Amino acid sequence: MHEMALCESMIEIIEREARDQHFARVRAVWVEIGALSHVEPEAMRFCFSAVAHGGIAADARFEIVSVSGAAWCMSCSKTVPLAQRSAPCPDCGGYQLQVTAGDELRVKELEVD
């Protein structure tokens, strides 16, 4: 479960920002998770709760913003929706795809005191 390591890194970033920006508590965390990122949203939710326990973000709401997958098809020169990395282009059936969205995992926003 790599989500635990991802959440540990996320908490480290949040704690560093708390020191740098002088906030005492995190009320909410919004995280963008791409459909092609190989990250399970519910596993992230569980792991964040476990890792944040007893810290600055212990009582924070954990909000997940889903980002749809998209790719540039080199065969038909179009940006197309992509549900999974191994899928062909839905327009031409080609496999020469460059992912342009949906592979991210990012802390989008923090609500702090």
UniProtKB/Swiss-Prot annotation:
InterPro entries: HypA/HybF
Keyword DNA repair: no
Gene Ontology molecular-function annotations: nickel cation binding; zinc ion binding
Pfam families, per database record: HypA
Gene Ontology process terms (BP): protein maturation; protein modification process
Keywords recorded for this protein, A-Z: Metal-binding, Nickel, Zinc
Positions of Zn(2+) binding: C73, C76, C89, C92
Similarity comment text for this entry: Belongs to the HypA/HybF family.
Function comment: Involved in the maturation of [NiFe] hydrogenases. Required for nickel insertion into the metal center of the hydrogenase.
Listed name of the protein: Hydrogenase maturation factor HypA
Gene this chain is encoded by: hypA
